[in-house]
Amino acid sequence: MNFPSTKVPWAAVTLLLLLLLPPALLSLGVDAQPLPDCCRQKTCSCRLYELLHGAGNHAAGILTLGKRRPGPPGLQGRLQRLLQANGNHAAGILTMGRRAGAELEPHPCSGRGCPTVTTTALAPRGGSGV
């Protein structure tokens, strides 16, 4: 049985080694860029670090990071509590925008027979809020 000759030219092997070996050796000697102290100590919000090391869909979070606008601090705080608490996160998050919009609506009723603003803003429509 005769196998065809598969000799590789010496110049091609040398060129390949010259192209691949130096970057590989340099990458071993280079340390990863250290994290800022605030991220290491968790004293500030390092959103990109949290996206990379947190749980969930990192790609979606990273791709939308530059497009997000900071919301009102109350809304952000409530979202953080919903995400970190136990329970049905989806229900709370999906109704959060509706509740935030309800708080900004003018209250049409004035007088003693009207419910308070907090109960109308937080109670779901058609329910008692309990």
Curated annotation (Swiss-Prot):
<dbReference type="GO" id="GO:0031772">
    <property type="term" value="F:type 2 orexin receptor binding"/>
</dbReference>
<dbReference type="GO" id="GO:0042755">
    <property type="term" value="P:eating behavior"/>
</dbReference>
<dbReference type="GO" id="GO:0097305">
    <property type="term" value="P:response to alcohol"/>
</dbReference>
<dbReference type="GO" id="GO:0001659">
    <property type="term" value="P:temperature homeostasis"/>
</dbReference>
<feature type="modified residue" description="Leucine amide">
    <location>
        <position position="65"/>
    </location>
</feature>
<feature type="propeptide">
    <location>
        <begin position="97"/>
        <end position="130"/>
    </location>
</feature>
<dbReference type="GO" id="GO:0060079">
    <property type="term" value="P:excitatory postsynaptic potential"/>
</dbReference>
<feature type="disulfide bond">
    <location>
        <begin position="38"/>
        <end position="44"/>
    </location>
</feature>
<keyword id="KW-0873">Pyrrolidone carboxylic acid</keyword>
<protein>
    <recommendedName>
        <fullName>Hypocretin neuropeptide precursor</fullName>
    </recommendedName>
</protein>
<dbReference type="GO" id="GO:0051928">
    <property type="term" value="P:positive regulation of calcium ion transport"/>
</dbReference>
<dbReference type="GO" id="GO:0031771">
    <property type="term" value="F:type 1 orexin receptor binding"/>
</dbReference>
<dbReference type="GO" id="GO:0098794">
    <property type="term" value="C:postsynapse"/>
</dbReference>
<keyword id="KW-0770">Synapse</keyword>
<dbReference type="GO" id="GO:0048471">
    <property type="term" value="C:perinuclear region of cytoplasm"/>
</dbReference>
<dbReference type="GO" id="GO:0043267">
    <property type="term" value="P:negative regulation of potassium ion transport"/>
</dbReference>
<feature type="signal peptide">
    <location>
        <begin position="1"/>
        <end position="32"/>
    </location>
</feature>
<comment type="function">
    <text>Neuropeptides that play a significant role in the regulation of food intake and sleep-wakefulness, possibly by coordinating the complex behavioral and physiologic responses of these complementary homeostatic functions. A broader role in the homeostatic regulation of energy metabolism, autonomic function, hormonal balance and the regulation of body fluids, is also suggested.</text>
</comment>
<dbReference type="GO" id="GO:0099013">
    <property type="term" value="C:neuronal dense core vesicle lumen"/>
</dbReference>
<keyword id="KW-0256">Endoplasmic reticulum</keyword>
<keyword id="KW-0027">Amidation</keyword>
<feature type="modified residue" description="Pyrrolidone carboxylic acid">
    <location>
        <position position="33"/>
    </location>
</feature>
<dbReference type="Pfam" id="PF02072">
    <property type="entry name" value="Orexin"/>
</dbReference>
<keyword id="KW-0165">Cleavage on pair of basic residues</keyword>
<dbReference type="GO" id="GO:0005184">
    <property type="term" value="F:neuropeptide hormone activity"/>
</dbReference>
<dbReference type="GO" id="GO:0007218">
    <property type="term" value="P:neuropeptide signaling pathway"/>
</dbReference>
<dbReference type="GO" id="GO:0051971">
    <property type="term" value="P:positive regulation of transmission of nerve impulse"/>
</dbReference>
<feature type="disulfide bond">
    <location>
        <begin position="39"/>
        <end position="46"/>
    </location>
</feature>
<dbReference type="GO" id="GO:0120162">
    <property type="term" value="P:positive regulation of cold-induced thermogenesis"/>
</dbReference>
<dbReference type="GO" id="GO:0005791">
    <property type="term" value="C:rough endoplasmic reticulum"/>
</dbReference>
<comment type="similarity">
    <text>Belongs to the orexin family.</text>
</comment>
<feature type="modified residue" description="Methionine amide">
    <location>
        <position position="96"/>
    </location>
</feature>
<dbReference type="InterPro" id="IPR001704">
    <property type="entry name" value="Orexin"/>
</dbReference>
<keyword id="KW-0732">Signal</keyword>
<dbReference type="GO" id="GO:0007200">
    <property type="term" value="P:phospholipase C-activating G protein-coupled receptor signaling pathway"/>
</dbReference>
<dbReference type="GO" id="GO:0007204">
    <property type="term" value="P:positive regulation of cytosolic calcium ion concentration"/>
</dbReference>
<dbReference type="GO" id="GO:0046928">
    <property type="term" value="P:regulation of neurotransmitter secretion"/>
</dbReference>
<keyword id="KW-0527">Neuropeptide</keyword>
<keyword id="KW-1015">Disulfide bond</keyword>
<keyword id="KW-0968">Cytoplasmic vesicle</keyword>
<dbReference type="GO" id="GO:0051970">
    <property type="term" value="P:negative regulation of transmission of nerve impulse"/>
</dbReference>
<dbReference type="GO" id="GO:0008156">
    <property type="term" value="P:negative regulation of DNA replication"/>
</dbReference>
